[in-house]
Amino acid sequence: MKNAALNPDVEKLLQEGTVIPAHPLALKPELTIDEDRQRALTRYYLACGAGGLAVGVHTTQFEIRKPEFNLLETVLRFASEEIQEEAKKRPLIKVAGICGPTNQALKEAELALKYGYDLGLVSLGGLNTWSDAQLIEHMVSISEVIPVFGFYLQPSVGGRLLSFEYWRDFVEIPNVRAIKVAAFNRYQTLDVIRAVSLSKRSNEIALYTGNDDNIVADLLTTYRFDINGKSIEKRFVGGLLGHWAIWTKKAVELLNEIKQCIADNYSGVDKLMSKGIVVTDMNAVIFDAKNSYKGCIAGIHEVLRRQGLMEGVWCLSPEEKLSKGQMEEIDRIYKEYPAFTDDEFVKQFLAAEKKY
């Protein structure tokens, strides 16, 4: 099956740059999906002004694909149904996570299309023994079904290292429309941006930061390369981030502030860079960086639990839980950076929902 073209309004928004939260999974204590809270979470992101959602991704927990849980189609359907009304008023970018070997990935791509998703965010985790050529063939097959959102996921949370040569070939695939860089590494981030900049398709591919450790600096930086005597510029236009699954109203405000700063010839950039350090400190705690990200999903859940958007921090994997001392560190950042949270907005949102 050949895919449909990307909706022009969605493509315009994708290129301009927006906030795309990675959607978490709301569970009940018995590890079944909490439908009311799952749907309310989607509505919360839309109420914050997010320009899209990524569902079935790392933050949604890869375990949703295991037969004993079998929740991939459910989460895709719930989010799609909740987005439907809002999408009549403004363009929204619906991104579906896709992973696994080619047969599995193609089935997931078809499933994403069934529920009206615009792009597939393709994770290459688990394909560590595949050569660059095999990976490119895999990506070409997926791109023939759905527009592709490339994804550099750091090895610490299930990704793999990818060469500059891989990215150079990847960006030439005609239906690659965007790339999320979540390498958490400046060298590897540079590999991707250089590969995009070298391509004749450079202007067709939107770059989104997934580097939760460097969000503000990524969004403020212009990358320049001298290519055949011509200066080529490329920048991250938005973010597709697990960190933006929490305090999302503030994320939307932050991206708007960054865009305004750039438009004003970087007026106020010092203040933004200082904000960036705060965001990194908060992310280090939420993502449990000091314990190699073991508590990253539970950390997101804990913030949502405190706000009343989730009932608990339960995850499908027993390995996914808050690390020792992480709760106290979350207390610290709440105390130190109250202006960076959106608790008041969430209170108003939940009051309007009249559910909890």
Q: In which residue ranges do the predicted regions lie?
A:
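Hydrophobic, Leu/Ile/Phe/Ala-enriched alpha-helical segments that form helix-helix packing faces
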Residues: 45, 79, 83, 196-197, ...
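Short alpha-helix boundary/capping motifs
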Residues: 73-74, 140-141, 170, 198-200, ...
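Active-site beta->alpha loop and helix N-cap motifs at the rims of alpha/beta catalytic domains
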Residues: 2-167, 319, 343-356
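Residue-level recognition of short, well-ordered coil/turn positions
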Residues: 50, 117, 175, 201, ...
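C-terminal alpha-helical cap/extension of soluble enzyme domains
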Residues: 2-10, 15, 20-24, 48-49, ...
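Catalytic alpha/beta core domains of metabolic enzymes, predominantly
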Residues: 144, 154-296
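Structural alpha-beta junctions
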Residues: 83-86, 90, 198-205, 262, ...
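Generic alpha-helical structural signal
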Residues: 39, 73, 77, 106, ...
